[in-house]
Amino acid sequence: YHVNVISNGDPLEIFTDKDGELIFKKYSPIGELGDFAAQICDSLRKTTDGIAAVCDRDTVIAIAGGAKKELLEKPVSAQLGEIMAGRSVYRHSTGGSSTPVSAADEKYCISVAAPVISEGDVMGCVLFITEKNSPPASEVEFKLAQTVANFLGKQMES
């Protein structure tokens, strides 16, 4: 059972079902890039041999390299939400506590998280993911996540 909290000012999509009932769904601009995000994740996986993902502010929308069953379309953790709100690229450090990607699965943790910012708003995040107690990400993964997040932000502006 999963509920997305709708805050004041969040865009909504409104649908009707076959019985005429109204369905309100939180609109995700980065979700519009779903196929594109999946291709980016696959490219990042091939380049780094790691697990790469893209999420919007609520759920993981694309993933490649593993953990698809455990994380795809699962809600992001509160800690990941805080990282996105902070608007800075995060990198897990040796000896630091692990930050889970999703509240639904504590096995997979954030190695690098780069927020996607478009027109001043946080839209989501580009992630490199590892299992708990894995070594920290390299500078290459850090810069790749940062570059892809900047690129996605620019794509959403056009």
List where the protein language model places each region:
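A short beta-strand signature within small-molecule sensing/ligand-binding domains used
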Residues: 105-117
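Short beta-strand-centered segments at strand-helix junctions
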Residues: 1-5
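Short, basic amphipathic alpha-helical segments that act as recognition/interaction helices
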Residues: 10, 16-27
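Short hydrophobic/glycine-rich mini-motifs in sensory/regulatory modules
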Residues: 20, 116-126
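Juxtadomain coupling helices with adjacent low-complexity linkers
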Residues: 31-43, 73-82, 90, 125-158
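Structured interaction and signal-relay segments at domain junctions
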Residues: 30-32, 38-105
